[in-house]
């Protein structure tokens, strides 16, 4: 077992009951274009077109062969674009149950499945987009050969669902999905799980199960990759979430695209925090209707640390998200708040007297607790960074856009979520995820 000691389990109220319930009926679903880094679409549909579940909506010009398909049957109601014609979302009004189907495979056939056949089914069904590559965190290229593939069956994000609860409902599909994933590489498949959790193992020779314990970010794939098979500019690995492995298994066992998702609907503003069953790309306006306390709430697709704000054309469940978090908008100003005792505030530096009650949970809001200021190296980043890098130096280089130095300090290993805790504890209120993405984009462009 690998035990992570540096990090932080956010003491936030609103943790979900680890029991699966049916979610609200969803009337609209969407594919969010900006989730797919560097993607440039060639559209296959127009507004008012009728589409079947699994029908191609668009293809990626920058990653030829990667298809994006409809998560439900219905009518294309909106194709939203932003600045420079960037695709924001393709919105479908759900109606009917028509779908495109594929061939079925027995367990014996899966064990000897041809790699090209596995790729063909995943690509044509649109499920290939579940596979992402490090470095750069883009959808995996169809002609690439990864050193290894990581299956993330652990989640230490604040307010997250327990993967073991969800996998227990889909054991056969999960095992079949692992068989499919193992056909995509000559290297190892690392299944990373919480220490002591009941995630099933596999008899496949390529599959290795590794346990991680300790505090967040013990559950992030960046942590797993760093410890088990680190990447470089010339070496890539792929990774996939446990619910997408289940979807792979359902696809090959039944021939039907599986878009069900079990997510955590939680946070201080949720009346009844719990696990709910919904579908990929679900409208969060529909999903949270009647679920929230009155007030000015911020709905977040994903973790409170690294998720995306859900509003307008982006008010849908993200492709890679398995939780919806809700916080109160922290718009209030507090006079001389920095000298108050802070019995109801949390600080990693023990600035407030609340640290005398270490087990207390807080009704956190979106407030940053102050305005932007200088980056102050007081050891906060080192407290929450478990990877073998020098965080203060790396973060400084990211802000100053010193790409060469940032690359030498380990920027290629990281994704925005890996720096989310650094952003949270930063006295200067900097967004390090955005700075990292700018750096990675520059590195990729310059080769």
From Swiss-Prot:
GO biological process: sodium ion transport
Keyword NAD carried by entry: yes
One family name in Pfam for this protein: NQRA_N
InterPro entries from the UniProt entry: NqrA, NQRA_2nd, NqrA_C_domain, NQRA_N
Protein keywords: Ion transport, NAD, Sodium, Sodium transport, Translocase, Transport, Ubiquinone
EC class name: translocase
Record has Lipoprotein as a keyword: no
Reaction(s) this enzyme catalyzes, per UniProt: a ubiquinone + n Na(+)(in) + NADH + H(+) = a ubiquinol + n Na(+)(out) + NAD(+)
Top-level taxon of the source organism: Bacteria
Enzyme Commission identifier(s): 7.2.1.1
GO molecular function, one term: oxidoreductase activity, acting on NAD(P)H, quinone or similar compound as acceptor
Role summary: NQR complex catalyzes the reduction of ubiquinone-1 to ubiquinol by two successive reactions, coupled with the transport of Na(+) ions from the cytoplasm to the periplasm. NqrA to NqrE are probably involved in the second step, the conversion of ubisemiquinone to ubiquinol.
Subunit structure: Composed of six subunits; NqrA, NqrB, NqrC, NqrD, NqrE and NqrF.
Family stated for the protein in its record: Belongs to the NqrA family.
NCBIfam families referenced in this protein's UniProt entry, alphabetically: nqrA, PRK05352.1-2
Identification of the protein by name: Na(+)-translocating NADH-quinone reductase subunit A
Organism: Pseudoalteromonas translucida (strain TAC 125)
């Amino acid at each position: 077992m690998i035990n992570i000691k540096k990090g932080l389990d956010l003491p936030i109220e609103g943790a979900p009951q680890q029991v699966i319930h049916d979610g609200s009926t969803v009337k609209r679903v969407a594919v969010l274009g900006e989730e797919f880094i560097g993607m440039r679409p060639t559209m296959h549909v127009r507004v008012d077109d009728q589409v079947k579940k699994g029908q191609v909506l668009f293809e990626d010009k920058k990653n030829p062969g990667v298809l994006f398909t409809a998560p439900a049957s219905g009518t294309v109601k909106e194709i939203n674009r932003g600045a420079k014609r960037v695709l924001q979302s393709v919105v479908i009004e759900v109606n009917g149950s028509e779908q495109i189907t594929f061939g079925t495979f027995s367990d014996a056939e899966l064990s000897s499945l041809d790699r090209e056949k596995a790729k063909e089914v995943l690509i044509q069904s649109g499920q290939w987009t579940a596979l992402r590559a490090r470095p750069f965190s883009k959808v995996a290229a169809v002609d690439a050969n990864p050193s290894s593939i990581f299956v993330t069956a652990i989640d230490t994000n604040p307010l997250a669902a327990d993967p073991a609860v969800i996998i227990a409902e889909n054991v056969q599909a999960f095992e079949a999905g692992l068989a499919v994933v193992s056909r995509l590489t000559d290297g190892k498949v690392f299944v990373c799980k919480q220490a002591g959790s009941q995630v099933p193992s596999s008899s496949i020779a390529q599959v290795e199960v590794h346990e991680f314990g300790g505090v967040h970010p013990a559950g992030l794939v960046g942590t797993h990759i760093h410890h088990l098979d680190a990447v470089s500019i010339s070496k890539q690995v792929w990774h996939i979430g446990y619910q997408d492995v289940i979807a792979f298994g359902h696809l090959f066992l039944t021939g039907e695209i599986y878009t069900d998702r079990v997510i955590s609907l939680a946070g201080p503003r949720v009346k009844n925090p719990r696990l709910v069953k919904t579908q990929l790309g679900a409208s969060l306006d529909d999903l949270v209707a009647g679920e929230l306390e009155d007030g000015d709430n911020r709905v977040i697709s994903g973790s409170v640390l690294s998720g995306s704000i859900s509003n307008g054309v982006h008010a849908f469940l993200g492709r890679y998200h398995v939780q919806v978090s809700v916080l109160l908008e922290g718009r209030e100003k507090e006079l001389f708040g920095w000298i108050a005792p802070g019995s109801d505030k949390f600080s990693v530096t023990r600035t407030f007297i609340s640290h005398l009650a270490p087990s207390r949970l807080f009704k956190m809001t979106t407030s940053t607790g102050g305005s932007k200021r200088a980056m102050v190296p007081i050891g906060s980043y080192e407290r929450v960074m478990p990877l073998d890098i020098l965080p203060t130096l790396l973060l400084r280089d990211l802000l100053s856009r010193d790409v060469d130095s940032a690359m030498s300090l380990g920027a290629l290993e990281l994704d925005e979520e890996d720096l989310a805790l650094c952003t949270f504890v930063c006295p200067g209120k900097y967004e390090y995820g955005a700075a990292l993405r700018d750096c990675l984009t520059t590195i990729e462009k310059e080769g």
